[in-house]
Regions:
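Carbohydrate-active catalytic/glycan-binding domains of CAZyme proteins
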Residues: 1-439, 443-483
Length: 483
C-alpha cells in the first residue's frame, strides 16, 4: 500500500469490514506489540512488523496505521516510518526492530524508542509528526556516555515503554524468562528531557517469576512487554506475565515504584474467563502477548495481538473494549471478533479469519516455541502471495470455529465457503456445546464452494460457532448470513 491509503475491506465483504473487526488491520498485515495513542483526532498504533510465513520475530521495518477516533473500523496506512538500516549499531543489518514505543517530548516532537534484536541497549529516533519519517537521534546513555544496558551491573534492555511528564521521561524495560535468575524484573529508568540521558539509574518496579514470592505477583509475574499509561489518576503498568498469553496490569501513585498487581486485562485465549466454558479451557492458540490500553472518546480499549499460521512469528493486532468497574478496576476483556464495542451486523458475508475462537478435541494453550503446530490443529493462514486471501486451514473433525458477536434479526439461512478433501457437516450453534441451530453439508471440493442450510436462531445478540464433524481436512474462507 502507499502512504495515506485507507483500508476498508476486500471488495466482496467491504461493507461488513467497515465495522470494527479483529484483527483491526487488513488480513495480510502483521503488526504485533501494538502501542496505541490518540494524537489529535486520530488513533495511531506503533508496533513491530512480522510477516506471513516468517520464521523469526519482527523482520520488517516499522510501519504505522491510524484511524479516526470516531471510526475504529477504517484504518489508514501511514507508510514506513523507520528502517532498521538507520541505526548506526545495525550497519550489518543483523538486528531486527523489536517492539517500540512512542512518547511526545517537551519540545512537542515524537520520540520512537526501540531495541534491536541483537543488542541490549535502547535506541531513539525522532520526528516532528506522529507518522512521518523518523530520523535516528541516539542511544540512551549515562552522563559519562556509557550506554544504558552496558554499564557494570546493568541488566539488558528490552521492550521499551515510555512516559514523558514535564522535565522527566520514564523508561520501562525488561525481559525475565523462567529459570534465569540474572533477570530480576521490570525496570524504570528516569531520563532527562533530551530523551537520551539517564537522570536516575534503573530501579525494579515489578518482579520476574524467579523473585515474585511474597510480592502479590505470584503466578502473574513480569515476563516482558512493559507499557505505562495514566489511568484513573494513577500510573498503570501493563505487561506480559510469565504465562505469556495474558496482559496484566498494576497500579501505583508513583511512576518509579509501589506498583500493586491488580489483575488480567486480556488473555489471548480467554483463560481465566467462564464465558460459557471452564475457566481453564483455551479458546484460541497462543504464545506471547504485548500491547497496552488507551482511552478513545471516553471509552477504554486494550490492544493486544494474536498468533496465526500455527507459529510464533505471524502475529496480528486485535483490540477489545474494556469494562471499568465502579471502583476503577479493569475487568478481564473477552476476546471477540467485533472488538466488543458493539455487535456486528447480522447479515451479509464475513471472512472466516475474523474468528476469535478456534479449538479442537485436543486442548492446547501454546503455539510451540521455535516450531509449528502439528496437523491436529486448525490455523488462520493466507494464500502464499502478496496480500493473499486469508482463511482457516486444516479444520478436522471436532474442530470448532467461533465468532462473537452478531446482532441477529430475522436470520433464515447461513452459507459457508469451504474447500478441501473433506466430507461431513458444520453444526451451527450459539454457544459452546449448545443445541444445534442447523447443519450445513460439507463436500469434497478442489475449489472454493458454497454450502447452505436453514438455521433456527432467535433475534438478539449471539455468538456463532461452526463445529465440523466428518473426515478429511477442511479450509474455511467465509460465511454469509441470509435474512
Amino acid at each position: 500500500m502507499t502512504a495515506g491509503e485507507i483500508f476498508s475491506g476486500d471488495r466482496s465483504i467491504e461493507r461488513n469490514l467497515r465495522q470494527v473487526t479483529n484483527p483491526y488491520l487488513p488480513s495480510w498485515e502483521y503488526v504485533p506489540d501494538g502501542e496505541p495513542y490518540v494524537f489529535g483526532d486520530r488513533v495511531y498504533v506503533y508496533g513491530s512488523h512480522d510477516e506471513f510465513g516468517g520464521c523469526v520475530y519482527c523482520p520488517g521495518d516499522y510501519v504505522c496505521w491510524s484511524a479516526p477516533v470516531t471510526d475504529l473500523g477504517t484504518w489508514r496506512y501511514e507508510g514506513v516510518i523507520y528502517r532498521k538500516s538507520q541505526d548506526p549499531l545495525n550497519a550489518d543489518m543483523q538486528g531486527n526492530l523489536y517492539a517500540p514505543d512512542v512518547a511526545v517530548g517537551k519540545d512537542g516532537r515524537y520520540y520512537l524508542f526501540y531495541v534491536l534484536s541483537d543488542r541490549g541497549t535502547v535506541s531513539v529516533a525522532v520526528c516532528s509528526t506522529p507518522a512521518g519519517e523518523y530520523e535516528f537521534l541516539g542511544h540512551v546513555h549515562y552522563p559519562d556516555g556509557t550506554l544504558l544496558g552496558e554499564k557494570d551491573g546493568d541488566e539488558p534492555q528490552f521492550d521499551p515503554g515510555v512516559l514523558a511528564e514535564g522535565d522527566s521521561v520514564y523508561l520501562y524495560t525488561g525481559f525475565c524468562p523462567r529459570g534465569d535468575k540474572s533477570r530480576h524484573g521490570a525496570m524504570c529508568t528516569v531520563l532527562e528531557s533530551d530523551m537520551l540521558t539517564v537522570k536516575r539509574a534503573p530501579v525494579f518496579v515489578a518482579p520476574g517469576c524467579e523473585y515474585s514470592e511474597g510480592t502479590g505477583y505470584e503466578g502473574h509475574a513480569f515476563f516482558e512487554a512493559p507499557s505505562i499509561r495514566r489511568f484513573m489518576g494513577k500510573y498503570c503498568f501493563i505487561y506480559s506475565s510469565e504465562r505469556c498469553h495474558e496482559l496484566c496490569w498494576a497500579l501505583s501513585d508513583s511512576p518509579t515504584g509501589g506498583f500493586k498487581y491488580m489483575g488480567v486485562a486480556v488473555s489471548g485465549c480467554d483463560l481465566g474467563l467462564e464465558n460459557g466454558k471452564r475457566a481453564d479451557m483455551p479458546l484460541f492458540y497462543c504464545a506471547n502477548n504485548h500491547g497496552s490500553i488507551v482511552e478513545i472518546e471516553g471509552r477504554w480499549y486494550v490492544f493486544y495481538h494474536r498468533h496465526t499460521n500455527g507459529t510464533n512469528y505471524s502475529r496480528q493486532g486485535c483490540l477489545e473494549k474494556l469494562e471499568i468497574t465502579a471502583d476503577g478496576c479493569i475487568k478481564q476483556a473477552e476476546i471477540t471478533s467485533c472488538g466488543s464495542a458493539k455487535p456486528l451486523r447480522g447479515e451479509g458475508e464475513y471472512p472466516a479469519y475474523i474468528a476469535c475462537n478456534i479449538f479442537g478435541k485436543d486442548e492446547q494453550v501454546y503455539v510451540p516455541w521455535q516450531g509449528w503446530m502439528d496437523d491436529r490443529f486448525a490455523r488462520i493462514t493466507q494464500q502464499p502471495r502478496e496480500k493473499g486471501e486469508s482463511f482457516i486451514a486444516n479444520i478436522r473433525s471436532g474442530t470448532t470455529v467461533g465468532f462473537k458477536y452478531f446482532d441477529i434479526k430475522g436470520l433464515r439461512r447461513i452459507s459457508v465457503r469451504t474447500m478441501g478433501y473433506a466430507r461431513g457437516r458444520f453444526t451451527v450453534s450459539t454457544s459452546i456445546g449448545g443445541r444445534s441451530a442447523g447443519e450445513i453439508p460439507i463436500g469434497y471440493f478442489n475449489v472454493w464452494a458454497d454450502g447452505e442450510s436453514e438455521v433456527d436462531i432467535p433475534d438478539g445478540v449471539h455468538a456463532l460457532y461452526f463445529t465440523f464433524e466428518g473426515e478429511g481436512a477442511l479450509q474455511f474462507s467465509s460465511f454469509r448470513l441470509i435474512c
